[in-house]
Amino acid sequence: MRYTFVLGNAPSQKRFIDIRMQPSIGCNFAIKDHKLTHLIVADRMAVHEVRKLPTRTETKYWCKASPLETPPGWHDLEFPGLDSGSAALALAAELYPNNEIIAIGFDGVLGLSDENAYEYAFRPNPKPEQIRARHRATVEQIYPDLPRTRFVSYQSDPVLETISYDQALKIAITQSRSLYQEPYQA
């Protein structure tokens, strides 16, 4: 079984910093801490901030901004109405339909954390609970159309399939080792 790693905005994704996870799709500022295959940036403010960071040639950049505002070399993301985390899950399903998805850093969606520095720093309104509820509803809406997707969590969820941090780390390390032994095929 092959896996695609999707990194949300929550601080818990930092537990996986030193592991080469390929293929991987990150949201917004995950590019600071991870070597990603793909990066999804949610809006103009984030695009502006991410463009200040050094460009990584191994990463394909995607944004939801209008084509008039898409930076040179970036790709337009065609998932209207989805936040960056949900769009990253949808992109993983589109690009790697035969892979199982391991979703890391979706703490707000799972009701585990109030921390999400990106979302709340740029958008102090609406309230964090409203944002989390909207993101949760979006994930639940697209969840049935995704390949098998497991969310990394320390507790179970009534709707979304979860996996422990230890299990996810083991999968990431195992797949990372196999990357050096055989060429990857989607």
Residue ranges and their predicted role:
Residues 1-186:
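Metal-ion/cofactor- or nucleotide/acyl-coenzyme-handling active-site neighborhoods
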